[in-house]
Amino acid sequence: MRFFIDTANVEDIKKAHQMGVIGGVTTNPSLVAKEGVDFHTRLREICEIVGDLSVSAEVIALDAPGMVEEGKELAAIAPNITVKVPMTPAGMEAVKQFKELGIKTNVTLIFNANQALLAARAGASYVSPFIGRLDDIGQDGLDLVETIANIFAIHGIETEIIAASVRHPVHVTKAALLGADIATVPYKVIEQMMKHPLTDKGIEQFLADWNNAQSK
């Protein structure tokens, strides 16, 4: 499994990139609005930080021609931009056109397997099932990841699965076991994934033993 960082915060992106643990970035209008910055300017900043790693940038238009126009503008910012498109009929029409133009797409707001299958057949590079939001309404988001992975494997579908709306490290571990290709996670989840009390205790013990040896 690969990891994308789900944020528009450049400091978090820098930290994750410097550790060498991410293979891309996902953003959405809410994340960019939270930063209070110009969308295109921030995308350029992100692309400068991560080089040729995938950067998903979402369109705002709701009609296919508008999505395609916006997507072309986004893709012109850098060759590694992946255009993020909502799972709607207009979105599928746009995905088909982006495929013909050679522009990668990430179909977002996937909440059932049929949506993922349709997006893949339209030509999506990635589909993003939302784990946490399904959990919020009493459904098992991880079951959806497994179902999509099984369907794609049975039919030889190459569209990659991005586990999205990841709330905690357990989501990551289980998504990896269930067949997700990628998990896109906030920086706080990356931090949580690295932590374990026995790791901290072990470091403290090593340092204590070293200092004791040096004082003799």
From Swiss-Prot:
EC number(s) on file: 2.2.1.2
GO cellular component annotations of the record: cytoplasm
Keyword Metal-binding carried by entry: no
Location of the protein in the cell: Cytoplasm
Organism domain of life: Bacteria
Reaction(s) the record says it catalyses: D-sedoheptulose 7-phosphate + D-glyceraldehyde 3-phosphate = D-erythrose 4-phosphate + beta-D-fructose 6-phosphate
SUPFAM superfamilies named among the record's database cross-references: Aldolase (SSF51569)
Family matches, as InterPro entries: Aldolase_TIM, TAL/FSA, Transaldolase_3B, Transaldolase_3B/F6P_aldolase, Transaldolase_AS, TSA/FSA_arc/bac
Entry's transmembrane regions: none
Molecular function via GO: aldehyde-lyase activity; transaldolase activity
Pathway: Carbohydrate degradation; pentose phosphate pathway; D-glyceraldehyde 3-phosphate and beta-D-fructose 6-phosphate from D-ribose 5-phosphate and D-xylulose 5-phosphate (non-oxidative stage): step 2/3
Enzyme class, broadest EC rank: transferase
Keywords tagged on the record: Cytoplasm, Pentose shunt, Schiff base, Transferase
Residues annotated as the enzyme's active site: K84
GO biological process: carbohydrate metabolic process; pentose-phosphate shunt
Entry's family note: Belongs to the transaldolase family. Type 3B subfamily.
Purpose: Transaldolase is important for the balance of metabolites in the pentose-phosphate pathway.
PANTHER family (UniProt xref): TRANSALDOLASE
Protein name per the record: Probable transaldolase
Organism from which the protein derives: Exiguobacterium sp. (strain ATCC BAA-1283 / AT1b)
